């Protein structure tokens, strides 16, 4: 008897489909993962968003500046191509990336951003919080109360609010994920001129550990602790660069290009490290990639230093 038509079709069709699948390239490491990067408009956040997207992640680029967030998302989309968008949502071209604004010191703003991420992608897997501020002392060496409060609002409370709002969604999803906060080598090194910043980063270090306990076992929580990142950082405008050069007795001229001054200061900081090389946003992005992905799936409650080797910041 002849083979039934359906059986003959099944034999030929599925063999061909399996052959096609075998010829397809392997999925990238973060394929089908949705990662929110808070602070993605510039510096470490922007570099992290781009790095994770190259590994296949869908990126929700978030910044207090909507324009900056959308610029990062547009850069990612220009490399990978746009998606079909969602009719009526206002979130068009949300294939590889979407840009949203949020103030991480405001719970309602965070909630609206997370809802926007859910509209775009149905949920999210991981969050990287790279947003931060540096508030220097005034000329007398004093830190005004408002400046102290705003430093802690962004560098500590902001990360807590993001984690607290995201926790409900993570619990509802029931899927494993990762939260990566940004601390600093300054968290363990005392010095003059950065009292509010350094103290806030010390608090952020312990926030990582506390959140790791609170969000276990579904969510791993870790921190990245950069040394001073000058190049590509929004925290180092020209005025601060010149102020730092003057503070350390390094030569400079007002007529010099900002890029030249930045490079000089970056190299000064580099000479204080064991590797003698400037710390860049790209260096930090590699750490976020490792902590978000599955390579360190048993690591939580830890601080990963990317500081070029600062002996004074070694664990005691």
Regions found by a protein language model. Name each.
Residues 137, 288-289, 300-316:
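Short C-terminal tail/terminal secondary-structure segment
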Residues 124, 144-160, 180, 197, ...:
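Catalytic Tyr-X3-Lys loop
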Residues 216-220, 299-301:
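Short, small/polar-rich loop/turn modules that mediate ligand/substrate recognition or access, typified
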Residues 41-42:
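Conserved glycine-rich cofactor-binding loop
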């Amino acid at each position: 008897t002849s083979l039934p038509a359906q059986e003959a079709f099944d034999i030929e069709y599925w063999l061909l489909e399996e052959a096609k699948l075998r010829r397809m390239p392997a999925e990238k490491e973060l394929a089908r993962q949705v990662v929110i990067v808070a602070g993605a408009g510039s510096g470490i956040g922007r570099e992290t968003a781009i790095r994770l997207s190259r590994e296949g992640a869908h990126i929700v680029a978030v910044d207090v500046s909507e324009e900056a967030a959308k610029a990062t998302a547009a850069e990612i989309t220009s490399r990978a191509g746009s998606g079909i968008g969602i009719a009526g949502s206002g979130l068009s071209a949300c294939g590889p990336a979407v840009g949203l604004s949020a103030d991480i010191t405001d719970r309602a703003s965070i909630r609206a951003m997370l809802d926007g991420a859910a509209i775009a992608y149905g949920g999210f897997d991981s969050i990287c919080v790279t947003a931060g501020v540096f508030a220097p002392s005034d000329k007398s060496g004093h830190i005004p109360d408002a400046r102290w409060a705003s430093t802690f609002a962004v560098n500590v409370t902001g990360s807590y609010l993001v984690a607290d709002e995201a926790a409900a969604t993570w619990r509802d999803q029931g899927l494993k994920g990762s939260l990566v906060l940004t601390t600093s080598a300054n968290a363990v090194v005392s010095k003059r001129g950065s009292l509010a910043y350094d103290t806030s980063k010390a608090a952020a270090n312990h926030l990582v550990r506390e959140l790791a306990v609170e969000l276990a076992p579904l969510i791993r929580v870790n921190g990245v602790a950069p040394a001073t990142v000058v190049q590509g950082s929004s925290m180092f405008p020209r005025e601060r660069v010149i102020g730092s050069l003057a503070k350390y007795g390094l030569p400079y001229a007002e007529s010099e290009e900002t890029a030249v001054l930045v490079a000089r200061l970056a190299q000064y900081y580099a000479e204080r490290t064991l590797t003698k090389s400037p710390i860049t946003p790209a260096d930090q992005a590699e750490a976020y990639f490792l902590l978000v992905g599955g390579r360190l799936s048993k690591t939580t409650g830890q601080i990963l230093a990317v500081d070029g080797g600062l002996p004074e910041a070694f664990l005691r």
